[in-house]
């Protein structure tokens, strides 16, 4: 068909998931979820930095690996003595144990008490990237010299599990071997819950999020306030209370931990007005969008929503892909891109959850330093929004429309007689949504041209 202006008429508009959910969501909240951080001492990341630390800062004339062990031994002893003096349980993790499940009772008890505290210390043996040394071939009569390299070694680590009345649950993991790398974990939803309670905003919680809220706009404003400073203040507050391998003199000389992003989860939660609608919509959405991992779709999702006009190269180690994970009764749709992925699943049976999981900020053209968290979150939120705009909505997803439900489900007439349902897609049922009164909500399926009666 040709328009009167000579241009070809556009085909029928593609109905997206964003079109279908409009008008059927009672709460739409975007918030950082899990934030997993690396802590590193910048001045100890090179062999020259190691030599300078011991020789020039600590005054050791011969820099050798023998200097590492006394610091680690003292740190391990200080942690155990500190835990015993404060009545903090020390738990040794075994291989294959789920640490979160082991520590959950301790964190729940601390949350019930409502008091900030270290709830437990976990001990484990894990592979860490640490400094090792090899003796150089030098004059036997002269001073020994060593070459320092970083290698993966199985060493002891301490998990310090914390309940903070402002942040919620979290942990700090400290390696006991030089250069003492650190990991830290917090949850943005848990922080937002405590801020909402402090502000007097009523809400109903999901297992990790919000199911309802008295003031959605105020809740979203709280979620938007989660910043690098929020995490940095929490980290410094608890590091000041813990025994550490580095001293205050080391800190004054610039030897202290800086934080960078190891993994971030930026989520969007859409709570439906009816859990029946939520499940039906999600199941149909899965069937319609099994090709999201194709290069052309991944390009739309992860690259600013624009096609770049050149072939999209697959990431190293594998191509683009879509993967369906099933754990118990939870089904998750995963779309992979480089080291990151986009997840979509049904949260607690009532909400559609979308999460952009970034394992390398460079995938989104961001730097790793914690100060870049706002930029990374903005880009991840845009990806979450583009997912619903990219997903196509087929016939099954139209079940969220009350009009379609009335057509495709049996009803009772005014005389009490049962009227049979019309099968969705049947020629007789297609004109019905188009003939419905203007006040009724229309299904996206009704936007197509009605067939002849």
Model-derived regions: residue spans:
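Long, contiguous, compositionally biased segments that the model treats as domain-scale units
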Residues: 1-263
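Surface-exposed polar/charged interaction patches
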Residues: 85, 390-393, 410
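Short, Lys/Arg-enriched N-terminal segment that forms or immediately precedes the first helix
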Residues: 410-422
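Amphipathic alpha-helical protein-protein interaction segments
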Residues: 422-425, 441
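Short, leucine-enriched amphipathic alpha-helices that occur as contiguous helical runs
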Residues: 425-433, 448
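Short, locally clustered residues in the helix-turn-helix/winged-helix DNA-binding domain
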Residues: 434-441
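Short acidic, hydrophobic short linear motifs in intrinsically disordered regions
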Residues: 442-453
């Amino acid at each position: 068909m040709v328009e009167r202006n000579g241009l070809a008429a556009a085909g029928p508009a593609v109905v997206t998931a964003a079109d279908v959910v409009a008008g059927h969501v009672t709460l739409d909240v975007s918030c950082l979820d899990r934030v997993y951080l690396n802590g590193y001492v910048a001045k100890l990341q090179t062999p020259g930095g190691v030599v300078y630390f011991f020789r020039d800062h600590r005054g050791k004339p011969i820099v050798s690996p023998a200097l590492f062990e006394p610091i680690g031994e003292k740190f391990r002893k200080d942690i155990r003595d500190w835990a015993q003096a404060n009545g903090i349980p020390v738990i040794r993790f075994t291989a294959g144990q789920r640490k979160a499940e082991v520590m959950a009772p301790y964190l729940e008890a601390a949350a019930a008490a409502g008091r900030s505290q270290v709830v437990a210390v976990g001990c484990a043996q894990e592979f860490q990237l640490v400094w090792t040394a090899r003796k150089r071939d030098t004059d036997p009569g002269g001073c020994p010299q060593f070459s320092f390299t970083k290698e993966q070694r199985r060493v002891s680590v301490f998990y310090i599990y914390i309940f903070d009345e402002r942040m919620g649950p979290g942990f700090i993991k400290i390696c006991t071997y030089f250069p003492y790398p650190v990991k830290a974990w917090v949850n943005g939803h848990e922080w937002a819950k405590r801020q909402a309670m402090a502000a007097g905003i009523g809400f109903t919680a999901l297992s990790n999020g919000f199911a309802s809220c008295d003031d959605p706009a105020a809740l979203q404003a709280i979620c938007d306030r989660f910043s690098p400073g929020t995490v940095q203040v929490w980290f410094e507050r608890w590091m000041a209370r813990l025994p550490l391998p580095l001293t205050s003199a080391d800190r004054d000389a610039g030897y202290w931990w800086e934080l960078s992003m190891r993994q971030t989860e930026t989520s969007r939660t859409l709570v439906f007005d009816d859990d029946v609608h939520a499940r039906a919509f999600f199941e149909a959405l899965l069937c319609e969008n099994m090709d999201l991992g194709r290069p052309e779709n991944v390009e739309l999702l992860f690259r600013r929503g624009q096609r770049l006009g050149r072939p999209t190269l697959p990431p190293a180690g594998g191509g683009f892909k879509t993967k369906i994970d099933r754990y118990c009764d939870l089904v998750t749709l995963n779309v992979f891109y480089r080291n990151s992925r986009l997840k979509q699943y049904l949260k607690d049976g009532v909400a559609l959850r979308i999460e952009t999981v970034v394992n390398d900020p460079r995938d989104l053209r961001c730097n790793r330093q914690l100060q870049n968290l706002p930029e990374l979150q903005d880009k991840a939120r845009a990806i979450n929004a583009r997912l619903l705009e990219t997903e196509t909505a087929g016939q099954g997803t139209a079940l969220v429309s009350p009009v379609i439900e009335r057509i495709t489900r049996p009803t009772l007439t005014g005389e009490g007689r049962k009227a049979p349902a019309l099968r969705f897609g049947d020629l007789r049922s297609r004109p019905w949504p188009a003939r419905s009164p203007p006040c009724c909500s229309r299904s996206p399926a009704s936007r197509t041209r009605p067939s002849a009666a």
